[in-house]
């Protein structure tokens, strides 16, 4: 059983501190340089078999949203796992941009930074995994 963190960030951005395991489940992280790569990660077998996905779409320019929004929406709608969206306080969330039918189990917004939202996101997933057994 796996928790997959999909993170859209520049290669120079520091990686969040993630545990190797959470409630006995492996934690894997995929770093993506664009929304196109985020979409590709969501379509990979690794994401399709994950128990939970923590999705950090980061900041993308309007051109990326125009080019990838529809495909990203389709990938999220097909995602079998529940997911948590880590949202930047200064950016609209996925639901506002994509009008999702399969919305996140939770949206975490920390006013300090997206990085600061990781501990709460992991705690939510950890609790849900512990409840699921």
What are these regions (language model features)?
Residues 1-4:
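Extreme N-terminal starter segment of soluble prokaryotic enzymes
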Residues 6-21, 28, 92-133:
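Short, glycine-/small-residue-rich phosphate/pyrophosphate-handling segment
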Residues 6-7, 56, 85:
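Short beta-strand segments
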Residues 25-38:
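A short beta-strand-loop structural module common to alpha/beta enzyme folds
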Residues 27-29, 53, 83:
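Hydrophobic beta-strand scaffold residues
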Residues 35-46, 68-75:
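A short, acidic, amphipathic alpha-helical segment used as a generic capping/interface helix at domain edges
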Residues 41-62:
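Short, glycine-/small-residue-enriched flexible loop/hinge segments at domain edges that mediate gating
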Residues 60-97:
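Mid-chain, well-packed structural core segment of small domains
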